C-alpha cells in the first residue's frame, strides 16, 4: 500500500506525538527505509516511456521559449544626461576623507571599465536587429533603431564613422582624448575659414561649421598624394562639409582609404543632395572592397574609397541616386502602395547621417556587429515602455568563452543578520545603472550593434525582392521592396517619427561607450561600484546603514526624521558625482524592508507576497502521476529553492527533484510527495537573525555512540548499528538541540557546521533540518570538546567548559568595501615540501 501523507509526516517526526528522539531519529538514517520510501513515493527515477510534460502552469522548459508580444505603442525610455564624473574619487575623498584601499581599487575598476575577450566573432549587419517579431518586422526595426539612436544621443553609444574613427555625444572623458597623438590632418594650407582638423594634443575633433566648404585642392602631403585639379564636389552640393582623413605614419594609408591594389588614384565620386551609398553593386564589382560607412549630405566624415576605374560612374553620365530612400522621389509610382507616395509627402527629409559632437580614433572596427538586439517590455509591471535586449552571448559560449569574475552575493542568513533590525528604511532607484559606468574605447570593436538599413532588412525578410545581379540599380529592383504591409507600416510610423524615417532607414554601426547589460562582466562591475559607493556613504554616516546589491540601494536610520535628513545628504552626494537617481521611484518602507525578493523586519525575513502567490499557483497547477520534463523541473526547483529556507525541511525536501535534474530524467510527482511539498510551502517560517552569545552546549559522536555536554551535565548513548561519522555527528547535534533547547551548539564536524544536510540519507536530512532550524553552530577542536569523552563512553572525566563566544557572520557582504586580501605572489621556484606543491593538481 502506498505511503499516505499522514504516515509520511509521522515518519519524518514532523508531528508532536513521535516517540523519543534518540530511538526514532537514527532509524531515518537506515538505507533500507530510505529506499522503500523512495519506491513508495515514486522517487526512484525509472526510465519513463509515457511522453513527458513540457509545460506546468507558467513554467516551460528552457528550450521552449515563451513567445513575447510586440507592443506597437512602446515608448522609448529617456536617458537623461547620465555622466559619471571623472573626478569621482576626488569627490568621494572630499565627502568622507581618504578612501580605503578597497574602495579605491573598486572605483578604479570602473574608471574606465575594460573588456578583454579572447576571440570576437563578427556577424553581418543583417543580424544587427533580430527578427524577433515576424508579424511586426518593420515596426520593430524602427522602434529598435529609435532606441539605439536615443542611446547614442545620450552618450551611451559610439557611432562608427570609419574603420578607425567614431563619434559620440555628451561630455568626453580624458581617456577618450588621449587616443590621438601626433596625428596631422590633410588640410588645405590656405585654410579659408576652415580650422585645423585636430591639434597635436587633443584626440577629440570638434565638429566643423556646417558652412565650411571643401577646398579645391590637397597640397602635397607626407604621403605624396597629389589631388587632381578641380572641385571635388560638383556644384549641386551646397551644404557640403569637408573631406577628412587622418594620417598616422608615413607608410600607412589615410584612415578610410581602402587600396584595391590597382594603383589608381582616388576617385571621389560625391553624390548630390544625398549620400555616398555603397550598395551591393560595389561588392559585386569588386569583392575586395568591404562594405563600409556611407557619406552624408552634410559631408562631415566622408570616407574616401578607391574605386576601380570600371565601376566609377561619373556625375555627368546618368548618375544613380545613391540614397535608397530618396531614389523613390523621381520614379513613377508602381502601385497604390508604392513607397514613392510616402517619400513625396515631405520636401526635406533631412540628412542621411548624423554625427556626434566629438570624434575619436578607435582601434580597427569592421562594419559588422558582434551581437543582435531586440525590444521587450521594460518589466512585467511596465509594458508601456520598452527595454533593449543585447545578445552578446558569444562571449559566454564555446572554448573561447570569457570566465567572468565572481563576486559575493549575500546569502539569506548574512542578509538577515545585516538588515534585520528596528531601523526605518528607504530604497533608492538608480536610473539606468549600467549605463553610468564608462567603457574604455578599446572595447568598442568587441561590442558592436547596429542595423543594415531598411532596404537590406526588408529584402532579406521578403522572398519576392531577391536582388539579382543584372537588375541592380534598375527601377524594377527599387520597387521590389514596395508592398502593402511596408507601405501601411511606414505610413503609421511617419505620424510618430516624421522625417526621422529617412535617417533610420540608413545603415549604422554603434559600439558601446558605457557597459552593456548583455555581458557577464557588467553585473560584476556594477556590484563593485555600488558597494564602494555604499561603503563611502556608510563611513560618512556611521550611525546609519547603507547597503547595495547591484543597482538596489537601501538606507536605514533610527527614526523617520533622521532617515529623511540622511536621504537628502546622500542624494545630494550621489548627484554631485553624476549618479542619476530617479527620485519619483524612491520607496519608503517604514520598519519592514523589501529587498532582493525578501521582506526583512526586526523579526527576520520572509519571501515577498508575490513570491508566495507564485508558490500557490505552482502547486495548484502541478500534475500528479505524470512525467514532467527535467527542464521544467529546473524552473520549478528555481522557485521552490528560493523559498526553501523558510520551510520546515528546507533544501533536503527538494533532493529527489535535484537528483532527477542531474540525471536528466523526467520526474513524476506522487500524491504523497506533492502533498508533503505543498504543506511545506503553505506554512512559511521566518529566518531569524543570529544573535551573539556564549556556547554552553557541546555535541560529539563516534560511529558507535554519541555524547553531550550541557552546562555541567554529561550524557551519552549508543547507536544500534555503527553509522558513518557525519551521520553520527548530525544525530548528536539533533539530540543536543532537542534535550537542551539551546540555539547555540559547539561541534567539531565541518559538515554539521556548514548546515547543509543535502548529502545525508534523505529522510534524516529532512528531519534534521526541522530539528536544527534556527540553530547556530560554533567550531570546537576535538581535543577541547567537552562532549568528546562521553561520546567514547567515559562519563567520569570532566574537561572544563570552554568559553566559546559566537559572533554572527555577515559573510563576505561586509558593510565596508572590504574583500579578502589577494595572496602574495610566490617566487618562481617552489620548494618541494611546500604546501603549494603538494596541493597542486594537473589542470
Swiss-Prot record:
Keywords: DNA replication, DNA-binding, DNA-directed DNA polymerase, Endonuclease, Host-virus interaction, Hydrolase, Inhibition of host innate immune response by virus, Inhibition of host RLR pathway by virus, Magnesium, Metal-binding, Multifunctional enzyme, Nuclease, Nucleotidyltransferase, RNA-directed DNA polymerase, Transferase, Viral immunoevasion. PROSITE patterns: RT_POL (PS50878). One of its GO terms (molecular function) is RNA-directed DNA polymerase activity. Residues 178-346 are annotated as: Spacer. Residues 1-177 are annotated as: Terminal protein domain (TP). Residues 202-221, 285-310 are annotated as: Disordered. Its EC number is 2.7.7.7, 2.7.7.49, 3.1.26.4. It comes from the Viruses. Mg(2+) binds at residues 429, 551-552. Residues 357-600 form the Reverse transcriptase domain. InterPro entries: DNA/RNA_pol_sf (IPR043502), DNApol_viral_C (IPR001462), DNApol_viral_N (IPR000201), HBV_DPOL (IPR037531), Rev_trsase/Diguanyl_cyclase (IPR043128), RT_dom (IPR000477), Viral_Replic_Matur_Polypro (IPR051320). Residues 347-690 are annotated as: Polymerase/reverse transcriptase domain (RT). Activated by host HSP70 and HSP40 in vitro to be able to bind the epsilon loop of the pgRNA. Because deletion of the RNase H region renders the protein partly chaperone-independent, the chaperones may be needed indirectly to relieve occlusion of the RNA-binding site by this domain. Inhibited by several reverse-transcriptase inhibitors: Lamivudine, Adefovir and Entecavir. Pfam families: DNA_pol_viral_C, DNA_pol_viral_N, RVT_1. Terminal protein domain (TP) is hepadnavirus-specific. Spacer domain is highly variable and separates the TP and RT domains. Polymerase/reverse-transcriptase domain (RT) and ribonuclease H domain (RH) are similar to retrovirus reverse transcriptase/RNase H. HAMAP family: HBV_DPOL. Belongs to the hepadnaviridae P protein family. Hepadnaviral virions contain probably just one P protein molecule per particle. This is Protein P. It comes from Hepatitis B virus genotype F1 (isolate Argentina/sa11/2000) (HBV-F). The lineage of its organism: Viruses, Riboviria, Pararnavirae, Artverviricota, Revtraviricetes.
Amino acid at each position: 500500500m502506498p505511503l499516505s501523507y499522514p504516515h509520511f509526516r509521522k515518519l519524518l517526526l514532523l508531528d508532536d506525538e513521535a516517540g523519543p528522539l534518540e530511538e526514532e531519529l537514527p532509524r531515518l538514517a537506515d538505507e533500507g527505509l530510505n529506499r522503500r520510501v523512495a519506491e513508495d513515493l515514486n522517487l526512484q527515477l525509472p526510465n519513463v516511456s509515457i511522453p513527458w510534460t513540457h509545460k506546468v502552469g507558467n513554467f516551460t522548459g528552457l528550450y521552449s521559449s515563451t513567445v513575447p508580444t510586440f507592443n506597437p505603442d512602446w515608448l522609448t525610455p529617456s536617458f537623461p544626461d547620465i555622466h559619471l564624473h571623472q573626478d569621482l574619487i576626488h569627490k568621494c575623498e572630499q565627502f568622507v576623507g581618504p578612501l580605503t584601499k578597497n574602495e579605491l581599487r573598486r572605483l578604479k575598476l570602473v574608471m574606465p571599465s575594460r573588456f578583454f575577450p579572447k576571440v570576437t566573432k563578427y556577424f553581418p549587419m543583417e543580424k544587427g536587429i533580430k527578427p524577433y517579431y515576424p508579424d511586426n518586422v518593420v515596426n520593430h526595426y524602427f522602434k529598435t533603431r529609435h532606441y539605439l539612436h536615443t542611446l547614442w544621443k545620450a552618450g551611451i553609444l559610439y557611432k562608427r564613422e570609419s574603420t578607425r574613427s567614431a563619434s559620440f555625444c555628451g561630455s568626453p572623458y580624458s581617456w577618450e582624448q588621449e587616443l590621438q597623438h601626433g596625428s596631422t590632418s590633410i588640410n588645405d594650407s590656405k585654410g579659408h575659414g576652415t580650422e585645423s582638423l585636430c591639434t597635436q594634443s587633443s584626440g577629440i575633433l570638434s565638429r566643423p561649421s556646417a558652412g565650411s566648404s571643401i577646398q579645391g585642392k590637397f597640397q602635397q602631403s607626407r604621403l605624396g598624394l597629389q589631388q587632381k585639379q578641380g572641385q571635388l564636389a560638383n556644384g549641386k552640393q551646397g551644404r557640403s562639409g569637408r573631406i577628412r582623413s587622418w594620417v598616422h605614419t608615413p607608410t600607412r594609408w589615410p584612415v578610410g582609404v581602402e587600396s584595391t591594389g590597382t594603383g589608381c588614384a582616388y576617385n571621389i565620386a560625391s553624390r548630390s543632395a544625398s549620400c555616398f551609398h555603397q550598395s551591393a553593386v560595389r561588392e559585386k564589382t569588386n569583392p575586395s572592397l568591404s562594405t563600409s560607412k556611407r557619406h552624408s549630405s552634410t559631408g562631415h566624415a566622408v570616407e574616401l574609397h578607391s574605386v576601380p576605374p570600371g565601376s566609377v560612374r561619373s556625375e555627368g553620365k546618368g548618375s544613380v541616386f545613391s540614397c535608397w530612400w530618396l531614389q523613390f522621389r523621381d520614379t513613377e509610382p508602381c502601385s497604390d502602395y508604392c513607397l514613392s507616395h510616402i517619400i513625396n509627402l515631405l520636401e526635406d527629409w533631412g540628412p542621411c547621417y548624423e554625427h556626434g559632437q566629438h570624434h575619436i580614433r578607435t582601434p580597427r572596427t569592421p562594419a559588422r556587429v558582434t551581437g543582435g538586439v531586440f525590444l521587450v517590455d521594460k518589466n512585467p509591471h511596465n509594458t508601456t515602455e520598452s527595454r533593449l535586449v543585447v545578445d552578446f552571448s558569444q562571449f559566454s559560449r564555446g572554448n573561447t568563452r570569457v570566465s567572468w569574475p565572481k563576486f559575493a552575493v549575500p546569502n539569506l542568513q548574512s542578509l538577515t543578520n545585516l538588515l534585520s533590525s528596528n531601523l526605518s528604511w528607504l530604497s533608492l532607484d538608480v536610473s539606468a545603472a549600467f549605463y553610468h559606468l564608462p567603457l574604455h574605447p578599446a572595447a568598442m570593436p568587441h561590442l558592436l550593434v547596429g542595423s543594415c538599413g531598411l532596404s537590406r532588412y526588408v529584402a532579406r525578410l521578403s522572398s519576392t525582392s531577391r536582388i539579382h545581379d543584372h537588375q541592380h540599380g534598375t527601377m524594377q529592383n527599387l520597387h521590389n521592396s514596395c508592398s502593402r504591409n511596408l507601405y501601411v507600416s511606414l505610413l503609421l510610423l511617419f505620424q510618430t517619427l516624421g522625417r526621422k524615417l529617412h535617417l533610420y532607414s540608413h545603415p549604422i554601426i554603434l559600439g558601446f561607450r558605457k557597459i552593456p547589460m548583455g555581458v557577464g562582466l557588467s553585473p560584476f562591475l556594477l556590484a563593485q561600484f555600488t558597494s564602494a559607493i555604499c561603503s563611502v556613504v556608510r563611513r560618512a554616516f556611521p550611525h546609519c546603514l547603507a547597503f547595495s546589491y547591484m543597482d538596489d540601494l537601501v538606507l536605514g536610520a533610527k527614526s523617520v526624521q533622521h532617515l529623511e535628513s540622511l536621504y537628502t545628504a546622500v542624494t545630494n552626494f550621489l548627484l554631485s558625482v553624476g549618479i542619476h537617481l530617479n527620485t519619483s521611484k524612491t520607496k519608503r518602507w517604514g520598519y519592514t524592508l523589501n529587498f532582493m525578493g525578501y521582506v526583512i523586519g526586526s523579526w527576520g525575513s520572509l519571501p515577498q507576497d508575490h513570491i508566495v502567490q507564485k508558490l500557490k499557483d505552482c502547486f495548484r497547477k502541478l500534475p500528479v502521476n505524470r512525467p514532467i520534463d527535467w527542464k521544467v523541473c529546473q524552473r520549478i526547483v528555481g522557485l521552490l529553492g528560493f523559498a526553501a529556507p523558510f520551510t520546515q525541511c528546507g533544501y533536503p525536501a527538494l533532493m529527489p527533484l535535484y537528483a532527477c535534474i542531474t540525471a536528466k530524467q523526467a520526474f513524476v510527482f506522487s500524491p504523497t510527495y506533492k502533498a508533503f511539498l505543498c504543506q511545506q510551502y503553505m506554512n512559511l517560517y521566518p529566518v531569524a537573525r543570529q544573535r551573539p552569545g556564549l556556547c554552553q552546549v557541546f555535541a560529539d559522536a563516534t560511529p558507535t555512540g554519541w555524547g553531550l555536554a550541557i552546562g555541567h551535565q554529561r550524557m551519552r548513548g549508543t547507536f544500534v548499528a555503527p553509522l558513518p561519522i557525519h551521520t553520527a555527528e548530525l544525530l548528536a547535534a539533533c539530540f543536543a538541540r532537542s534535550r537542551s533547547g539551546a540555539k547555540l551548539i559547539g561541534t567539531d564536524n565541518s559538515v554539521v557546521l556548514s548546515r547543509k544536510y543535502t548529502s545525508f540519507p534523505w529522510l534524516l536530512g529532512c528531519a534534521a533540518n526541522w530539528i536544527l532550524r534556527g540553530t547556530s553552530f560554533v567550531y570546537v577542536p576535538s581535543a577541547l570538546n567537552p562532549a568528546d569523552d562521553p561520546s567514547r563512553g567515559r562519563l567520569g572525566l570532566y574537561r572544563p567548559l570552554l568559553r566559546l563566544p559566537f559572533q554572527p557572520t555577515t559573510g563576505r557582504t561586509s558593510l565596508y568595501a572590504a574583500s579578502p586580501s589577494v595572496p602574495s605572489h610566490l617566487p618562481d621556484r617552489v620548494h618541494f615540501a611546500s604546501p603549494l606543491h603538494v596541493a597542486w593538481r594537473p589542470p
